[in-house]
From Swiss-Prot:
The gene is gpaH. Residues 353-403 are annotated as: Disordered. This is Guanine nucleotide-binding protein alpha-8 subunit. One of its GO terms (cellular component) is cytoplasm. It holds the Pfam family G-alpha. G proteins are composed of 3 units; alpha, beta and gamma. The alpha chain contains the guanine nucleotide binding site. Residues 195-204 are annotated as: G3 motif. Residues 374-389 have a biased composition (Low complexity). Residues 264-271 are annotated as: G4 motif. Residues 172-180 are annotated as: G2 motif. Disulfide bonds: none annotated. Residues 31-356 form the G-alpha domain. Guanine nucleotide-binding proteins (G proteins) are involved as modulators or transducers in various transmembrane signaling systems. G alpha-8 is a potential analog for the G(s)-like G-proteins which stimulate adenylate cyclase in mammals. Residues 322-327 are annotated as: G5 motif.
């Protein structure tokens, strides 16, 4: 009985050592999963990051909340100024005298460095302008000029934004457009695995920085704005957003440095796409499309277009159709992608356990002898005889620790 009990204690100790080893291995980079988040400008990469932070309960501090509030106010004003400028370009005249006055007020307003909030008068002008029929005519032709996808959200929530005690909600933060400049890294742990999600600005002038992020990447997440098939770029109004995205995807996935890197294609803004496809045919972007307004057919066609950009025909492409503004979509996508990554890196996990067995074999034998002598002090461990059944599970990747 004493010998059996001692063996159980040694097994428990080995399992404990394994857990500590894997955690340490993660800290040292052995289980450091670096994931590169790429995509053209305004594809929704930053929204994906915000949702991951929420899922892993990474708190937004007061300074960040304040920054979000400031950007919400600035975005709201910018969106109406863009609409008014587009109306002039398109030759759509504002016929109502009151509307003209409000338009002049909004167009002439500028945020000064010390001004962090739009005045109530400007906010009310914007709210009334959004209701105007001529402004809606401009909005109906939004495929002809650059705009923010969240434009209606800002205008529909403007009363709340104007409140003196306004604090952005989680949805407000998700919907806030903050242009990514430089390189942003979001880190979180899951078990012994340390994830680093690297987000780099998607605008053309930011892409030269991407090369600095290409080393030691475990996976590529390429985010696409589905609604971009009927939108133009901020940097170049003559260029279609989706065509730009396709070109960029081809350049990235065919780079030799990523020949063995798992690639995930995230077709984002599905909610907007489902609305747009009913009004604007996909053939506007792809003349060879013949599927009409059927959402499923259109999504499969777009997915095929991206698949065709991969020169290695046998390279798998894992694809998701989502709306990143909804946490459940990101949670599902992340769980699926994470499972694939851990499965493909199972050899690393197994090597970690193999190294541990070698280093702990001698200490286990000596522990067995010492534990036998102290048998009478260890009666409370009898119920642990089947602990872990010789396995430890790391998010679906099972590592055996017994020969």
């Amino acid at each position: 009985m004493g010998c059996y009990q001692s063996r159980v204690q040694v097994e428990d100790k080995t399992n404990e050592q394994l857990d500590k080893y894997l955690v340490q291995a993660g800290k040292e980079g052995l289980l450091d999963f670096r994931i590169l988040l790429l995509g053209a400008g305004e594809s929704g990469k930053s929204t994906v990051v915000k949702q991951l932070k929420s899922i892993y309960k990474i708190q937004v501090d007061d300074d960040e909340l304040h920054s979000y509030a400031v950007n919400i106010h600035k975005n709201t004003v910018l969106c109406m100024q863009v609409l008014l400028e587009a109306g002039e370009t398109l030759g759509i005249e504002l016929t109502d005298p009151e509307t003209k006055k409000r338009a002049i007020n909004v167009k002439s307003f500028q945020f000064e460095p010390e001004v962090k909030q739009m005045p109530v008068s400007i906010g009310l002008d914007i709210e009334e302008l959004w209701r105007d029929e001529d402004i809606q005519k401009i909005w109906d032709r939004r495929s002809e000029y650059w705009f923010l996808d969240a434009t209606p959200y800002y205008f529909e929530n403007i009363q709340r934004f104007l409140d003196d005690d306004f604090v952005p909600t989680e949805e407000d933060c998700i919907m806030t457009r903050v242009r990514t400049t430089g390189i942003s890294v979001t880190e979180f742990d899951e078990g012994p695995v340390h994830f680093r999600v690297v987000d780099v600005g998607g605008q053309r002038n930011e892409r030269k920085k991407w090369i600095h992020c290409f080393d030691d990447v475990k996976a590529l997440l390429f985010v696409v704005n589905l609604a971009g098939y009927d939108q133009v770029m901020f940097e170049d109004p003559s260029q279609n957003r989706m065509q730009e995205s396709l070109t960029l995807f081809g350049q990235i996935c065919n780079n030799p440095i990523f020949s063995e890197t798992p690639t995930f294609l995230v077709l984002n803004k599905k909610d907007l796409f489902e609305q747009m496809i009913q009004k604007t045919d996909l053939s506007k972007c792809f003349p060879d499309y013949k599927g009409g307004s059927d959402v499923k057919t259109a999504l499969e066609f777009i997915q095929m277009k991206y698949q065709q950009k991969i020169q290695e025909s046998n390279k798998p492409l894992h694809t998701f159709h989502i709306a990143a503004r909804y946490k459940k979509d990101i949670k599902y996508t992340w769980e699926e992608a994470k499972g694939i990554l851990l499965e493909e890196n199972k050899k690393v996990l197994m090597k970690a356990t193999k190294d541990l067995k070698k280093s702990s074999k001698q200490s286990s034998k000596s522990s067995l002898g010492n534990s036998t002598q102290n048998n009478s002090n260890n009666n409370n461990n009898n119920n642990n005889s089947n602990n872990n059944n010789g396995q430890t599970t790391i998010d679906g990747a099972t590592a055996k620790i017994n020969s």
